[in-house]
C-alpha cells in the first residue's frame, strides 16, 4: 500500500477511486476548513501584538514571548496560504476536467442519436423523394397555369382588328379635343368704306367763357 493510500485509508487493486464530483466536494470542504484556520490565526496574531505592546518596556520577557508566538502564528498562516493556493489550483483543474468529460459525454450521446436517426435513411431514396417533390411541384404549377388561362368560348377575335379600331376611336377623341381648344370658326365681316366723318365745330375759348358768365348771371338774378 502506498503512502497516500495509508494516509487516506485507500488501497488495493479492487479499490474504486472517488468520482470527480466527490473529489471536488472534498477539496471545497478542505478549503473551507483552511479558511477558518486562517481567520483564527489572524485573530491570534492581533492578540499577541496587543500583548507585546501592552507589556512593552515594563515586562520585556512577556513582550518577547508574545512576539515569538506572533511569529509562529504568522509562519503557520503563510503555510496555510500556500496550501490554499495549491488546493484551489487542483480543484479548478479537476472542475475543468469534469466539465470536459461531461461535454464529451454529451457530444458522444448526440452523435449516437444522430447515427440512429440516419440508420433508416438511404441517400438514393432521399434523392428520389426530392425528385418526386420537384415533379409534383412542376405539375401543380402547370395545372395552375392551365386553370388561370382564359378560355375563348366562341369569342375568338382578331387582335389586329381590335387594335386598329381602338386607335381610330382614340384619333377621333383627339380631334374632338383639338376643336374644342381652338374655338368656333370666325366669320369675316363685310368691308366698310373708310370715309372721314365731319368734325364737330369747336367754339372758341372766348365764346365759351362768355356763355358761362351769362349762365352764372342768370342763375344769380333768378
From Swiss-Prot:
Biased composition (Low complexity): 188-200
A GO biological-process term: exit from mitosis
Coiled coil: 21-182
Cellular location(s): Cytoplasm, Cytosol; Late endosome membrane; Midbody
Pfam families: Snf7
Keywords: Coiled coil, Cytoplasm, Endosome, Membrane, Protein transport, Transport
Membrane topology: Peripheral membrane protein
Signal peptide range: none
GO cellular component terms, semicolon-separated: cytosol; ESCRT III complex; late endosome membrane; midbody; nuclear envelope
Record-linked InterPro entries: Snf7_fam (IPR005024)
Region (Disordered): 1-21, 183-222
PANTHER family found in the cross-reference section: CHARGED MULTIVESICULAR BODY PROTEIN, CHARGED MULTIVESICULAR BODY PROTEIN 4B
Quaternary organization: Probable core component of the endosomal sorting required for transport complex III (ESCRT-III). ESCRT-III components are thought to multimerize to form a flat lattice on the perimeter membrane of the endosome.
Family named by the database record: Belongs to the SNF7 family.
Purpose: Probable core component of the endosomal sorting required for transport complex III (ESCRT-III) which is involved in multivesicular bodies (MVBs) formation and sorting of endosomal cargo proteins into MVBs. MVBs contain intraluminal vesicles (ILVs) that are generated by invagination and scission from the limiting membrane of the endosome and mostly are delivered to lysosomes enabling degradation of membrane proteins, such as stimulated growth factor receptors, lysosomal enzymes and lipids.
Protein name: Charged multivesicular body protein 4b
Amino acid at each position: 500500500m502506498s503512502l497516500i493510500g495509508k494516509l487516506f485509508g485507500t488501497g488495493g487493486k479492487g479499490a474504486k477511486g472517488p468520482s470527480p464530483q466527490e473529489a471536488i466536494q472534498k477539496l471545497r470542504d478542505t478549503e473551507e476548513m483552511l479558511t477558518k484556520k486562517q481567520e483564527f490565526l489572524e485573530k491570534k496574531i492581533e492578540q499577541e501584538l496587543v500583548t507585546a505592546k501592552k507589556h512593552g518596556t515594563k515586562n520585556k520577557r512577556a513582550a518577547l514571548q508574545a512576539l515569538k508566538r506572533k511569529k509562529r502564528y504568522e509562519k503557520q498562516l503563510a503555510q496555510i496560504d500556500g496550501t490554499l493556493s495549491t488546493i484551489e489550483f487542483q480543484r479548478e483543474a479537476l472542475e475543468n476536467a469534469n466539465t470536459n468529460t461531461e461535454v464529451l459525454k454529451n457530444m458522444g450521446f448526440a452523435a449516437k442519436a444522430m447515427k440512429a436517426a440516419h440508420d433508416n435513411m438511404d441517400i438514393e431514396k432521399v434523392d428520389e423523394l426530392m425528385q418526386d417533390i420537384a415533379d409534383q411541384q412542376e405539375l401543380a404549377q402547370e395545372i395552375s397555369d392551365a386553370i388561370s388561362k382564359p378560355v375563348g368560348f366562341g369569342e375568338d377575335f382578331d387582335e389586329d382588328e381590335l387594335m386598329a379600331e381602338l386607335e381610330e376611336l382614340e384619333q377621333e377623341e383627339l380631334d374632338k379635343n383639338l376643336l374644342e381648344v381652338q374655338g368656333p370658326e370666325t366669320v369675316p365681316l363685310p368691308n366698310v368704306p373708310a370715309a372721314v366723318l365731319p368734325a364737330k365745330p369747336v367754339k372758341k375759348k372766348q365764346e365759351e367763357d362768355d356763355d358761362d358768365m351769362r349762365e352764372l348771371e342768370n342763375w344769380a338774378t333768378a
